[in-house]
């Protein structure tokens, strides 16, 4: 049905602003929508495959209702002196001034993506000559048996990389008689290490004692062991800053010593930048400082290093550089390890950073039995110092090296693999190769077009619900997004549903972000001018130190006024500060009755919050900017009519952040976190320019550097190849309150698109 009754008014979808469909959806959930013919409760159906329509809450056939709701030409035109805004009728010339609505957008039927090439089934039987229980294809067998000299194995997504690594190690031990203790197998996660050991014991029949003798571990664990054996007092594990909060404490102390309010500097980003400098192994005096943010972080870096030295402590990044320096200073020690590790296997080679690679090269000499397994198309960790150039230049570093391509994908269907391949082939800096699926399927990737982030989340959850009702398990699904803020709406929608889910901590903490807390503080303070927590978050935006909080508490008592009004009575304020605060204080009462999005816009402009954001300058976080958070919170605020209702929602979601316990169900995660995982059904959110690819990569590309843009394309490739059977790519028409353009990475797919998908 295309019509329903809301608040004694008939709603016709064909004349109703698409912007407000999400509002109608939520009104239906609350029981406020009714059939305009029979009067029974109805819902607005918003899903991926079908046009939006009203459906009765109770299942059944309602032909009379459907017939009554067929659109009829209106005999009376709309009154000229009125215009509509959602369900509110406004006098002509008047509008809600807070945030102009984007243009009405028609619903577009989703499109299916045609495979770039026809599926060609492979009839080659797997080879079981090495291990009867483990079949290997021709290329895998080559990678397993090519044991001498430098070898690069380019293992495409889902091509059996772990099988090759474990089979190779088992073959060398069982069939070639190589002592396990002479083998070094290095990867990036303890989970991968455990999985490889388990496979070697269970699938290949290696004796547990032999498996234990293989030196396996992460880069960090390997470097720690080497350092500990060289100087156990200095490199004792008790001196390691294992936890993130320990490192953050030193940065916070450094901020204090520099006279910087810790609420004004993203500690996590400072630590990430410091880690990047360490992992690229640039001497301190030669670190290029590009802007004021990096200059500030460099000063924090110096404080951080000094504090660690004073306490004889070290962090994970220190171990790599220290190990490298140890081998430079102690060639005799390096020679001992070279004699010990005559065969080296490196997993996820595309993620290696400069220091790690230098150490592995040193250990591999002079035998050069170095086997590196990776995929240049999955290099997505530039922010950690990794660089695809190491895998791309392997032949230059080792001119006699052999290269083996693993291009058979056993995870995903042909339509998914073909689509992902079309996307990544637009990159220039990569090995020329074509990934091929081992199986076909009639299900093809789907592009769908929600109005905005809110409708996007509703459509995805509706689709998941429908699939679960048809027998799917919640664990079959993953929802992927570029940055944590991109998962905010889907997190909220799943929280409101009965579907079990698990989410990254980052997406759960949206309402705890610094900028979000600060802008919301204006709204909280408007409702309660003695809200200490809100005022604490307001102070930085008013360019006041946290020490002012206690003064405000005292003044509110001695002057018999609210803490907000006490702001204008603070002593020792500079004249410009006093003038500004006197101007702002009365505005809190004005905010009280505004709509939430109006209040946020008012605080931005009239109360100076946008000016504060500009003065803060570069936050150091290229991916999650404060201004982006501000746009995100306005998208949420639009859904609520009153500030108390909006803040109740915020409080509810903050409580949910603290109380989440589910470990199973639909997986919500960033694309980075999804790497190495696989799911039957994958939804990729926000495939629009500015999200995937991210704004910062578009900016650098405009300046002539396309490295970041190519990494963004690899990121989409990684997201697409997580899907085993169903892949959905979302292209919202609006993002963060502005019109969005579908991702430029999708253009090659759209050229291959079939006719619109029919449900």
UniProtKB/Swiss-Prot annotation:
<dbReference type="GO" id="GO:0005829">
    <property type="term" value="C:cytosol"/>
</dbReference>
<keyword id="KW-0347">Helicase</keyword>
<dbReference type="GO" id="GO:0033202">
    <property type="term" value="C:DNA helicase complex"/>
</dbReference>
<dbReference type="GO" id="GO:0005524">
    <property type="term" value="F:ATP binding"/>
</dbReference>
<protein>
    <recommendedName>
        <fullName>Putative ATP-dependent DNA helicase YjcD</fullName>
        <ecNumber>5.6.2.4</ecNumber>
    </recommendedName>
</protein>
<feature type="domain" description="UvrD-like helicase C-terminal">
    <location>
        <begin position="414"/>
        <end position="676"/>
    </location>
</feature>
<dbReference type="Pfam" id="PF00580">
    <property type="entry name" value="UvrD-helicase"/>
</dbReference>
<dbReference type="InterPro" id="IPR014016">
    <property type="entry name" value="UvrD-like_ATP-bd"/>
</dbReference>
<keyword id="KW-0067">ATP-binding</keyword>
<dbReference type="GO" id="GO:0003677">
    <property type="term" value="F:DNA binding"/>
</dbReference>
<dbReference type="InterPro" id="IPR027417">
    <property type="entry name" value="P-loop_NTPase"/>
</dbReference>
<keyword id="KW-0413">Isomerase</keyword>
<dbReference type="InterPro" id="IPR014017">
    <property type="entry name" value="DNA_helicase_UvrD-like_C"/>
</dbReference>
<keyword id="KW-0238">DNA-binding</keyword>
<dbReference type="GO" id="GO:0000725">
    <property type="term" value="P:recombinational repair"/>
</dbReference>
<dbReference type="GO" id="GO:0016887">
    <property type="term" value="F:ATP hydrolysis activity"/>
</dbReference>
<keyword id="KW-0547">Nucleotide-binding</keyword>
<feature type="binding site">
    <location>
        <begin position="158"/>
        <end position="163"/>
    </location>
    <ligand>
        <name>ATP</name>
    </ligand>
</feature>
<keyword id="KW-0963">Cytoplasm</keyword>
<dbReference type="InterPro" id="IPR013986">
    <property type="entry name" value="DExx_box_DNA_helicase_dom_sf"/>
</dbReference>
<feature type="domain" description="UvrD-like helicase ATP-binding">
    <location>
        <begin position="134"/>
        <end position="413"/>
    </location>
</feature>
<dbReference type="InterPro" id="IPR000212">
    <property type="entry name" value="DNA_helicase_UvrD/REP"/>
</dbReference>
<dbReference type="Pfam" id="PF13361">
    <property type="entry name" value="UvrD_C"/>
</dbReference>
<dbReference type="GO" id="GO:0043138">
    <property type="term" value="F:3'-5' DNA helicase activity"/>
</dbReference>
<feature type="binding site">
    <location>
        <position position="411"/>
    </location>
    <ligand>
        <name>ATP</name>
    </ligand>
</feature>
<comment type="function">
    <text>May be involved in the generation of recombinogenic substrates for the subsequent action of RecA.</text>
</comment>
<keyword id="KW-0378">Hydrolase</keyword>
<feature type="region of interest" description="Disordered">
    <location>
        <begin position="68"/>
        <end position="121"/>
    </location>
</feature>
<comment type="similarity">
    <text>Belongs to the helicase family. UvrD subfamily.</text>
</comment>
<feature type="compositionally biased region" description="Basic and acidic residues">
    <location>
        <begin position="69"/>
        <end position="81"/>
    </location>
</feature>
